[in-house]
Amino acid sequence: IGLNYISGMILNTCFATKATLPIAKLYSLIRIEDDLIESSSYFYKEVDEIKKIIADTGNEFNSILLLDELFKGTNTIERIASAKSVLSYLEKQKSHVFVSTHDIELTTMLDDQFALFHFTESVVKSTIHFDYKLKKGILEQGNAIRILEIKNFPKEIVESAKKIVCEMK
């Protein structure tokens, strides 16, 4: 999305049959890393970047926000609560928000505010293949345990994980 936006605006070319691109500021929050030299944790750096985005959105310019797994540097409950609150806020601004998440709870909380899409995969001969085609709606089945299985994790771990998932649903 980001590369298509940039190439569309600069080169008047993008990978699309048709594109209508708004004049907007593009923000990407995808590859944040800990910085041991500056004693800055992943979470603190992410919070600082999100705060900059919040301060910059809602002004006279539209914004396109590309966000990946918000607040993944903290515990599950606070991550989901914080991400839901930030995304709900950004959605009210002049923003086009694109966010990726593995948090099923977050997707159900945002279902009435955002158009939800997902990717699926198939397993062929113990190899996982992604088609990278967006499908509407919430992903119904995860793939983490299946990947553990494909990577030949001990059966005890795989079965235990499956059991825990069933108990948590």
Indicate where each model-derived feature is located.
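ATPase nucleotide-binding head domains, primarily ABC-like/P-loop NTPase cores
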Residues: 1-169
